[in-house]
């Protein structure tokens, strides 16, 4: 690991440093700039993103509840550039058997599984749109800037992050090709890295932020994005399932969203607590796509 010898780095100072240009980080940046307008006090904000561009590491196709967006950007529906344009028009929640299915009545579902008033979206495109909004308000966004470590003061406070640090070996020691990167310092540092972010894990462990939390559940998700012909496209249709091809002792479920210009986002999530060593999530996903509830879409996709 690194010794205690100080490393000289260039640095830049901001009021707020945000790590991660996903939905949370970008919305936070926009809100800070709104506060700047409301108070008349300048707030400098920088967002660093490890992907080659905003959206490059956003894999989710999602059903978006617009309530928070309504509060943040009340006029978003009037923006012709906004990619959030597919309201949920119909939905199913199914239990799958090998060759059939059983719908669960909507009245029996918890509110979190009801999608009326929501939108089927590409989160990658949504984040790109949010980034344009943020930059127009004066937020600085730096893609291809992975934050590798926190910058700490002598008393342990977080002062910012180190970005652009390369040439670190697997043992944690610098190699001959080591480049120290630079420091982005802020009065406040916001970690919006998403699930299992490397800096977030450090902070969670150090400050025991998960002390009163339930044990984390892990799963692997497999996703495909299809382009289907008009006869197989139901814009605004959302479907979630559980059951086949997973067995009773393997948790998980699936989604299918019809959105945009004849796009279908489809995927399967398999909880990683399964005990059968022969379970192969990718192969289960291939089996899942043969089910009658989605097979017609698969065939159409193949024809394209």
What residue ranges belong to the model's regions?
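Glycine/serine-rich loop-strand microenvironments at binding/catalytic pocket rims
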Residues: 1-19, 23, 138-142
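Conserved Rossmann-like nucleotide-cofactor binding loop
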Residues: 24, 53, 196
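Residue-level detector of conserved catalytic or cofactor/ligand-binding positions
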Residues: 295-303
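Extended hydrophobic secondary-structure segments that form protein cores and membrane-embedded regions
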Residues: 16, 44-52, 186-190
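N-terminal FAD cofactor-binding segment of flavoenzymes
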Residues: 42-100
């Amino acid at each position: 690991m690194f010794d205690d010898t100080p490393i000289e780095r260039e640095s830049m100072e901001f009021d707020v440093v945000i790590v991660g240009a996903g939905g949370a980080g970008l919305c936070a940046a926009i809100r800070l700039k709104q506060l700047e307008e409301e108070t008349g006090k300048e707030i400098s904000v920088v967002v660093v993103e490890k992907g080659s561009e905003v959206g490059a590491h956003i894999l989710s196709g999602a059903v978006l509840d617009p309530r928070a967006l309504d509060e943040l950007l009340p006029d978003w529906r009037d923006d012709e550039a906004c990619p959030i344009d597919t309201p949920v028009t119909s939905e199913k929640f199914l239990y799958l058997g090998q060759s059939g299915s059983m719908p669960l009545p909507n009245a029996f579902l918890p509110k979190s599984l009801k999608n009326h008033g929501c939108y089927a979206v590409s989160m990658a495109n949504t984040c790109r749109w949010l980034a344009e909004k943020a930059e127009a308000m004066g937020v600085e966004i730096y893609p291809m800037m992975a934050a590798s470590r926190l910058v700490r003061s002598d008393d342990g406070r977080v002062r910012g992050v180190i970005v652009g640090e390369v040439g670190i070996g697997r043992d944690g020691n610098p190699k001959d090709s080591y480049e120290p990167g630079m420091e982005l310092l802020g009065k406040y540092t916001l970690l919006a890295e998403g699930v299992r972010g490397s800096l977030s894990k450090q902070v969670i462990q150090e400050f025991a932020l998960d002390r009163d939390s339930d044990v984390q559940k892990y799963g692997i998700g497999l996703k495909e994005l299809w382009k289907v012909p008009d006869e197989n496209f139901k814009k605004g249709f959302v479907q979630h399932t559980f059951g086949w091809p997973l067995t009773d002792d393997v948790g998980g479920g699936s989604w299918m969203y019809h959105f945009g210009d004849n796009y279908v986002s489809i995927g399967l999530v398999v909880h990683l607590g399964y005990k059968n060593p022969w379970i192969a999530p990718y192969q289960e996903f291939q089996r899942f796509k043969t089910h009658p509830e989605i097979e017609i879409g698969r065939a159409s996709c193949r024809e394209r």
